[in-house]
């Protein structure tokens, strides 16, 4: 069966299913499943023409300064994967991406590697969260995209482009905090509660963007992060000790 017939038949079988075009960290299958425990029915690699991969979604300056989105860019293209899912699963994905506080959903037309075209929804940074210029993402975040691109079989030339991107350097303590927090995010996602971690990151982002003195910002961060990191360490340890099936 060709990819064209497979895509067309899937649409005929369920008109309510939603196609999402993943191009950032959601390229990585384990992250996609762990972040929101998503169940994807079908997936196909493809490219989005006249758009670019942008790192212009404002994050937390000291932890994750930028996240990926797509922006119009004539002559450029973004490679990624088409994901077919139910409306319920798509709502879980939206919750895991900040509950509409970070991204808007744009309708795009993606060309699969087999040449067929499919309309899909992609995430683009809200104007209120968009930075005037792109900022390099962290290596942790960028590696999720790179590994996901390889696992999904994206074009070698595009993977080379991803490999050439610069990343934001974090210190050892920040790396540890980041590792624990994102482990916690995956744990909450696996139990169907991705919004808990999203709200934590929204609070940290609000503190980061506030006009508070730096000393007060760090006091607030420590107050919030201390119990969060203890919980993250417990969840991470439980996950590591869980018997392998």
Where do the model's predicted regions map?
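Glycine-aromatic micro-motifs
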Residues: 2-245
């Amino acid at each position: 069966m060709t990819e064209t017939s497979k895509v067309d038949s899937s649409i005929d079988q369920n008109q309510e299913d939603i196609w999402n075009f993943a191009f950032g960290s959601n390229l990585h299958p384990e992250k996609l499943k762990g972040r929101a425990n998503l169940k994807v029915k079908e997936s196909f690699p493809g490219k989005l023409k006249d758009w670019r991969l942008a790192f212009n979604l404002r994050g937390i300056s000291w932890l994750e300064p930028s996240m990926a989105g797509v922006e119009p860019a004539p002559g450029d293209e973004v490679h990624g994967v088409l994901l077919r899912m139910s409306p319920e699963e798509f709502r879980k994905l939206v919750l895991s991406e900040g509950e509409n506080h970070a991204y808007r959903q744009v309708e795009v037309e993606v060309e699969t590697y087999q040449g067929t075209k499919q309309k899909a929804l992609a995430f683009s940074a809200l104007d209120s969260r968009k930075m005037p210029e792109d900022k390099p993402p962290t290596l942790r975040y960028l590696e999720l995209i790179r590994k996901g691109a390889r696992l999904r079989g994206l074009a070698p030339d595009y993977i080379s482009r991803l490999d050439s991107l610069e990343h934001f350097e974090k210190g050892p303590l920040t790396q540890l905090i980041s590792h624990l927090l994102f482990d916690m995010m995956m744990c909450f996602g696996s139990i169907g509660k991705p919004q808990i971690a999203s709200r934590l990151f929204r609070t940290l982002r609000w503190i980061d963007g506030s006009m508070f003195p730096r000393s007060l910002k760090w006091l607030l961060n420590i107050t919030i992060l201390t119990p969060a990191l203890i919980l993250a360490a417990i969840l991470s340890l439980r996950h590591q000790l869980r018997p392998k099936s």
